[in-house]
Amino acid sequence: MIEAVDNLIITKGAISMSISAKDRSILRELAARQMELAHSSRNQQLYQDWIQYGKSKSGFRPMIRIEIETFEHQLLPGLMRCEGEEAREIEKRMLRPIVNFTRFEDDTLVPAYYPVYLHKRFVPFGLEVRRQESGSLGHHFIPYIHDLEEDEHLLGDSIYSVDEEGTRREEEQAKEIFDGILPVKRVTECMGCCPTQDIVHIMNMDDMYIAMVDDEDRFHAMMRRLTDDYLAFFRMQEEKGLLSSHADMQRLAQGSYCFTDELTDGISPAKLSDLWLFMDSQETAGISPDMYAELVFPYYEEMMSHFGLVSYGCCEASHPIWDNCLSRVPNLRKVSISPWCDEAFMGQRLQGTGVTYLRKPPATLLGMDTPTLEEDAVLDCFRKTAQAAKGCKIEIAQRDVYMVGGSAEKVHRFVELARKGLEG
């Protein structure tokens, strides 16, 4: 570490991270506010609610979380005071749960620590993702592979690494900034593995579908390699002793938390069997359940078997693949119920199982660039969920919202209506 009179300077790889004395003071003020909120009676009660929710099979109240990251550009800039780029990134990370807790009043917790995550990298087949931006929310992936038979030689070994030194430097920086105010904690979030997404990043979806039909052997070989590479990457972290178990308020994909009484929190070093895994396969929504069962699920099922618990799904419908595939996963504990899912079917299947009915409502209910809601539509949506998922363990994760009319009050009202609708 290099110290200066006015600045805290830490070198992170080839990047010099400089936090000015002014920005450091702002971050310390924010850290004090975070600790105040973390120890508030409401946050402490909410933490106990999540613990009870993690233990329950059903019957506990539905938990509701709003994922702010996709629309934070409409709300956070006016709250931010730091000037330096690095300081603003830290400030943004701290503000997210604070805004959820104080402005939205959903079930987001304010942590009594600043989390530092392991710096790691995984490049499937050694092919860096190439994207063409559209100038708006959309983008286009530029493919490497068009025909598996002709382009198979482009598939190299996957590249993966862990930057232990970079992680340590970030931890030291955070401790320097927050010394005496906010503890800094190394955190292992859930492990993620979505092979079909990786394939679509290097091979457009139509070509992937054609390969599934016309070149099954090469498609199987591609899935086999990717599964083996991911497992080697995860095993490397396990063998180096870099993992800690998570069964508490650590991040689980899809806007959820890791709360459960089936895993032990805080084991370090941990094994893969102590951890949550997240997987999805949105890209195969256009193939039949039988094709999914033959070409995709065997590799997913194998990966899932190495972990403690599993959360599955994003925007794809889960009901077509439930009976023949997902229901066979003994450690599945959360499944996404997207807007394209048959809610009643999945409610019937999940009732009494302890598998969380992780409802992802339509983004358009909240995500229109207007300051008000269609309140009747919001209520109807959540009443339908309450009816369909009666007897299930319900969790709401409102995601993929890109605009809210710049109104935190609108989001707060959405949470109020969701709670009212879920009451039946």
What residues fall within each predicted segment?
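Active-site loop segments of alpha/beta catalytic cores
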Residues: I2-I68, E83, T108-V110, I159-G424
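An N-terminal, globular interaction/scaffold subdomain
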Residues: K55-L127
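A contiguous, low-structure linker/loop signature
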Residues: R121-L148
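A gly/proline- and charged-residue-enriched helix-loop-helix capping module
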Residues: H139-R168
